[in-house]
């Protein structure tokens, strides 16, 4: 998968097209990611220990990984991902600038 938890991404399609956010969680088996502030849905929650009031909550729902691209650290634009081997480790690089995406 071309995005990981903590990556800054831009949404390419769907109702939240153009929005940017951070990947909160990645689900590689389902090819989906949870992006902060994107694809908000309303969840009707019963009263519980954590939420004694209950009611309607706004939470993020996962979106398909093909609808997001990482943001280039140099230019701030969405970029495709390439891979290089440095010091025996495979790292992700931004195709637009050649900058490393992995910290």
From Swiss-Prot:
Gene3D superfamilies: 2.30.30.30
Pfam families: KOW (PF00467), ribosomal_L24 (PF17136)
Highest taxon listed in the record's lineage: Bacteria
Coiled coil stretches, renumbered: none
InterPro entries named in the record: KOW, Rib_uL2_dom2, Ribosomal_uL24, Ribosomal_uL24_CS, Ribosomal_uL24_KOW, Translation_prot_SH3-like_sf
Record GO cellular component, one term: ribonucleoprotein complex
Keyword S-adenosyl-L-methionine part of the UniProt annotation: no
BP GO annotations: translation
Family as reported in the entry's similarity comment: Belongs to the universal ribosomal protein uL24 family.
Subunit-structure text: Part of the 50S ribosomal subunit.
Known function: One of two assembly initiator proteins, it binds directly to the 5'-end of the 23S rRNA, where it nucleates assembly of the 50S subunit.
Protein name, entry field: Large ribosomal subunit protein uL24
């Amino acid at each position: 998968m071309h995005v990981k938890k903590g990556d800054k991404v831009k949404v390419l399609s769907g109702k939240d097209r153009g929005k940017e956010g951070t990947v909160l969680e990645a689900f590689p088996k389902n090819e989906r990611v949870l992006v902060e502030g994107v694809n908000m849905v309303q969840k009707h929650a019963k009263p519980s220990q954590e939420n004694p009031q209950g009611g309607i909550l706004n939470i993020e729902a996962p979106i398909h990984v093909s609808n997001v691209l990482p943001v280039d650290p140099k230019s701030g634009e969405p970029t495709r991902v390439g891979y290089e081997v440095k010091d025996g480790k495979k790292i992700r690089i931004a195709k637009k600038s050649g900058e490393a995406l992995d910290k």
